[in-house]
């Protein structure tokens, strides 16, 4: 039986392949029900559903999948919780970013209009859509040439994953889709629109992905110089008053109440981003606590008290994570995806058979086989750029590399080298923060990869820092629920919600001095490879050769 006076909130976390809903007690953060709904369309990176082929580096989604999460995961989570839905007082969502929707003035996605069903640019561009790299290069070159004040806030480079590069690609490659797009909007804001019936824009995505700094987007003059006719993009398709994180976007509409089984009129929170929303769930709001949300990729987010310009970062935004602090973001484009790529493509079948016999996953089997090897015993160093480099090089045309293989090298050894490479990438990010005057005192890990104890110890040894772990297995969804509690008035601010509803296990992994010293030697080689191949000349050339070959 549940207390009839107890209040609950719902958080919905939209990932790359599925959406997760969690029902949470608003007073203490207890998660009483959860459910997951897989996207029917998944990620379209080779072709649309009708067979229309896609060029290299594309990644699209269908927005109906997002609504289906509300129709399926939320009612299922409510059912699993056993609570009276009338005790729910708020709902909040978070999303991968930058994932953007091209929509009409009333919020209808262009891909849902019959005349645009076969037009790739009418679909949602997922965060890992990297086909706008050339457009990002032009933005960076012009901004540097003109001395635009916002460029250093993003480490000196704008990513191909972000709003302006993606919008410029649409403008130049499908002018009809661009012309029909009234609102170019982050998916987290779009799904919030569907919940409350009103368009809102959040400060987080506007700052980190939309180049909104010091109260303004890039000027019309800059955009028109970038591509004639593109100058009205902000005024015509993007600009809207920004809402702080934790604010109430509106009340749940009757239609959305029908989808979700929640009471109409309850608070709908302003949208958020999956990584940033996790910070209060991990009780890591204090400056210097670097939160690494480790899954298919890793996003590093941290609050600070000073405004600093850090090379190769993803951005610094006033209030971008927590009101009252400067929020910093960095990241690695591929982490879990790299491990999955190796297992899916390069591991001999015998290892799969052994794992099946032991009733464990291949990932667990490979990890255990390599766990007892002394540091450096495989003689390998890898670059973790299989999905490009987000920080600190900001170049998604870079590619992965393993050096040191011999005829005696085994699959578990390569797998461990890949684990280590991702840890080296995180160390590179930490060192860059600290060299820029932004201290990192603690590494807090959230996401599915924290279950790999060997990987966590590697990160502690490589970074030389204690590792703390979030308690919740649904960090983003819990964080969204916490912001919903603020929007519903249960707490005055997210700091109070974090104290009451968040949880963390501090110092679970400590660096071992002997292993840490051995990793220092490997890291020197990683850094040498990083700097040598980081100019991108060879890797870009190889990618160009590949793209030309498959396009003919």
Regions found by a protein language model. Name each.
Residues 55-60, 133-158, 288-291, 486-499:
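A polyampholytic, Gly/Pro-enriched intrinsically disordered region
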């Amino acid at each position: 039986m549940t207390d009839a006076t107890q209040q609950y909130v719902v958080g919905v976390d939209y990932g790359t392949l599925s959406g997760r809903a969690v029902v949470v007690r608003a007073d203490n953060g207890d998660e009483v029900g959860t459910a997951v709904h897989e996207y029917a369309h998944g990620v379209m990176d080779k072709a649309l559903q009708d067979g229309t082929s896609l060029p290299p580096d594309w990644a699209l989604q269908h927005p109906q999948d997002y609504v289906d999460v509300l129709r399926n995961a939320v009612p299922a989570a409510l059912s699993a919780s056993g609570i009276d839905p009338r005790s729910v007082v708020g709902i909040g969502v978070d999303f991968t970013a930058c994932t953007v929707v091209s929509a009409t003035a009333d919020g209808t996605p262009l891909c849902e209009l019959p005349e645009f069903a076969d037009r790739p640019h009418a679909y949602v561009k997922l965060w890992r859509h990297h086909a706008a790299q050339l457009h990002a290069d032009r933005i960076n070159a012009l901004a540097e040439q003109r001395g635009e004040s916002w460029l250093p806030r993003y480490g000196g480079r704008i990513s191909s994953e972000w709003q302006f590069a993606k919008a410029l690609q649409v403008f130049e490659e499908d002018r009809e889709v661009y012309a029909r797009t009234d609102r170019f909007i982050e998916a987290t804001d779009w799904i919030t629109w569907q919940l409350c019936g009103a368009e809102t824009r959040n400060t987080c995505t506007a700052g980190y992905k939309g180049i909104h700094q010091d109260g303004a987007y890039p000027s019309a003059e800059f955009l028109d110089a970038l591509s004639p006719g593109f100058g009205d993009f902000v005024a015509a398709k993007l600009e809207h008053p920004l809402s702080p994180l934790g604010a109430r976007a509106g009340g749940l509409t009757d239609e959305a109440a029908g989808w979700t089984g929640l009471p109409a009129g309850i608070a709908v929170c302003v949208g958020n981003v999956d990584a940033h929303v996790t910070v209060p769930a991990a009780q890591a709001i204090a400056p210097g606590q670097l939160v690494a949300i480790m899954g298919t990729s890793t996003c590093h987010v941290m609050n600070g008290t000073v405004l600093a310009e850090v090379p190769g970062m993803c951005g610094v935004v006033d209030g971008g994570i927590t009101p009252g602090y400067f929020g910093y973001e960095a990241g690695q484009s591929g982490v879990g995806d790299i491990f999955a790529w190796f297992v899916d493509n390069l591991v001999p079948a015998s290892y799969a058979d052994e794992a099946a016999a032991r009733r464990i996953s291949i990932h667990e089997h490979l990890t255990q086989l390599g766990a007892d090897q002394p540091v450096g015993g495989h003689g390998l160093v890898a670059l973790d750029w299989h999905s490009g480099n987000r920080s600190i090089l900001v170049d998604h045309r870079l590619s992965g590399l393993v050096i040191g293989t011999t005829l005696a090298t085994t699959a578990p050894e390569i797998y461990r080298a890949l684990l280590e490479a991702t840890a080296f990438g995180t160390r590179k990010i930490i060192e860059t923060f600290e060299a820029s005057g932004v201290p990192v005192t603690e590494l807090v890990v959230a996401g599915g990869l924290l279950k790999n104890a060997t990987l966590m110890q590697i990160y502690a040894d490589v970074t030389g820092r204690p590792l703390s772990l979030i308690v919740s297995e649904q960090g983003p969804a819990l964080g969204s629920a916490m912001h919903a509690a603020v929007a519903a008035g249960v707490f005055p601010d997210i700091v109070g919600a974090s104290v009451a509803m968040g949880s963390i296990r501090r110092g679970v992994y400590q660096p071992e001095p002997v292993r840490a010293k051995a990793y220092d030697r490997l890291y020197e080689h990683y850094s040498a490879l990083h700097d040598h191949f980081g100019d991108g000349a060879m890797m870009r050339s190889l990618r160009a050769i590949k793209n030309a070959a498959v396009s003919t």
